[in-house]
Amino acid sequence: MRLWNKSFGKETKVKDFAGRTIAKGAYNDRNSDCGWNVDHILPQSRGGATADHNLVCCHILTNDEKADKFPCFNANGVSFEIIKVQNHYEIRQKTNEPKKQKDAPETVDF
């Protein structure tokens, strides 16, 4: 509950990063539509720490879909990627924008 309180304060129902509703009173309750647990952003199997900066409250189904996938995964029909930001990892929704080649011109005239 400490991570819930740190993340959401006094809120009793919120949406996780994948858009699923979780309820404070449904911690680890697989029989609840709003059941949630704590997930490692960078999986422990990949060296992720059990520290607040690497933990996120999420719906049990979201956690099941993410599992130990790294760096990309799908949850609730949405694509996500785990990226390193300074000294920690974050979950970001993937965008459909094509990546630009380094030093490639913005436009090409013919």
What are these regions, as identified by a protein language model?
Residues D16, H59-T62:
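Short cysteine-rich clusters marking metal-coordination/redox-active sites
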Residues I22-C58, K66-P71, V78:
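Histidine-centered nuclease catalytic patch
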